[in-house]
Amino acid sequence: MSSEDSLKSLSLDYLSLLINGQAFSDVAFSVEGRLVHAHRCVLAARSLFFRKLFCGLDPNHQPPPPPPPLNWPMAGGGGGGSGGGGRGGAGGGGGAPATPELVIPVSSIRYEVLVLVLQFLYSGQASVAAPKSGPLPGCGARGCWHTRCGAAVDLALDTLAAARSFGVEQLALLVQKQLESMVKEASVDDVMKVLMASRKFEMQELWATCSHLVARSGLSADLLAKHLPIDVVAKIEEIRAKSPLAAVAAPRSPFLTHHYLPMNPASSAADRDNKIRRMRRALDAADIELVKLMVMGEGLDLDDALAVHYAVQHCNRDVVKALLELGAADVNSRAGPTGKTALHLAAEMVSPDMVSVLLDHHADPNSRTLDGVTPLDVLRSLTSEFLFKGAVPGLTHIEPNKLRLCLELVQSAVMVTTRDDGAPVTGGAEAGGSDGGNFPRSDADDSLVSLTMNSTLMYQGQEMAAAVAAGEGRKSNNGRGSPPPAMYFPNGFA
């Protein structure tokens, strides 16, 4: 057996001791409700941090006192377990540990990070990459290989911080090498996180790699200044000034793809899904700046991601307004097998807030689905059902005042566009209306006309009366109200 094989065998033996040596352990770490058993002699031999820790605890192998408060990454102390029946009790055949097991609570690092640190201390080897396609906390992508996702980058950064805290420089260097390969395929916001970590830990090679990647991302200095310190932005601008590629890329549109790596066709679908999930989380948090960063730095297509449709369904008016003002999304983009626009969804939701903000940003009130249905047809159908049935299936709590206001807003927009086109106005959208077989309109036409006459006065008067009589205190739907409640959509776009 060669010396290399002997070292590998020794490494595996020590790693097996960490995994299966509970019966011989004399210390355990309690992290996130789980116990990680270890051995003081191994940890003290491999780490100066643990040597100093254990030298101050229980030198005569008596039941140890509670450990003193520890500096980051561990805090607090816990009592020792009893010999046979404690938490550090027997493993395997039921024998008791040679010495009472010391249990140390760890609260500032997570379980996966602690296990990685201990694996390196025992075997001299560790990898921040999770098992291929296996679960990794923080990553919800199915089948993700965790080679460049945000969760893998976060795990590597946490491991780097723990290695520095424990004084394990070999592990820190190993993680640095792995991060250098990860950032070349990571998103630009993850690269900026690694950039700041490399600055904190004074890792020059990692800093150089990340700074050049950010410089090549195409993000403007103003946008970088919102996410990075000004001195870091200045250094990135210096790199750009020295690079001939920066001058060539400068005239390009800020909404063209600026990603610094060619896409791998095998993983393009997973990349797209990951971007959409991150975009939706950003919209849920009203973080439009992050969405803008994804558009400019990663080439996110907001129309392909159905960003406006999602924001209309799940966010408030302000988020939809800010998203449309980015100028990177088509307000009339279509989604789903029927080709609905965001205005169709707002009409189905009976949300005056969404209808008004979409119309303010040039949504087409005459847009049709593949079935020839316009937003006005949707509202007329809901109104007909409300008049004849008293309630709309799936929208049992529909407010008639909101329905009237939505109908008036869309009808007014249709009249304006029809007048601008020079065509006669015949009942709202006659020139582009849907087939009569889709929405029966002949019997309810008179009711619809009377319903929409003077709708503003009816809306304001009934809203005030309802507030006085029932004390509900609803705000008038003038664009300053709260976002519409979640509703059932009979023909969702997904």
From Swiss-Prot:
Keyword vocabulary terms for this entry: ANK repeat, Cytoplasm, Metal-binding, Nucleus, Repeat, Ubl conjugation pathway, Zinc, Zinc-finger
ANK-type repeats, residues: 274-302, 303-333, 338-367, 371-405
Gene3D superfamilies, alphabetized: Ankyrin repeat-containing domain (1.25.40.20), Potassium Channel Kv1.1, Chain A (3.30.710.10)
A Pfam family of this chain: Ank_2
One GO biological process term: induced systemic resistance, jasmonic acid mediated signaling pathway
ZnF start-end (C2HC NPR-type): 136-150
Biased composition (Pro residues): 61-71
Region annotation Disordered: where it falls in the sequence: 60-94, 421-443, 469-494
Subcellular localization: Nucleus; Cytoplasm
Keyword Cell membrane: no
Residue ranges of domain BTB in the record: 25-130
SUPFAM superfamilies associated with the record: Ankyrin repeat, POZ domain
Pathway: Protein modification; protein ubiquitination
Record field: compositional bias (Gly residues): 75-94
Principal subcellular localization: nucleus
Gene Ontology CC terms: cytoplasm; nucleus
InterPro entries hit by this protein: Ankyrin_rpt, Ankyrin_rpt-contain_sf, BTB/POZ_dom, NPR5/6, NPR_central_dom, SKP1/BTB/POZ_sf
Domain notes: The BTB/POZ domain mediates the interaction with some component of ubiquitin ligase complexes.
Family: Belongs to the plant 'ANKYRIN-BTB/POZ' family. 'NOOT-BOP-COCH-like' (NBCL) subfamily.
Function noted in UniProt: May act as a substrate-specific adapter of an E3 ubiquitin-protein ligase complex (CUL3-RBX1-BTB) which mediates the ubiquitination and subsequent proteasomal degradation of target proteins. Transcriptional co-regulator involved in the promotion of leaf and floral meristem fate and determinacy. Required for the abscission of senescent organs, probably by regulating the cell wall disorganization in abscission zones (AZs, e.g. pulvini at the base of leaves).
Protein name, entry field: BTB/POZ domain and ankyrin repeat-containing protein NH5.1
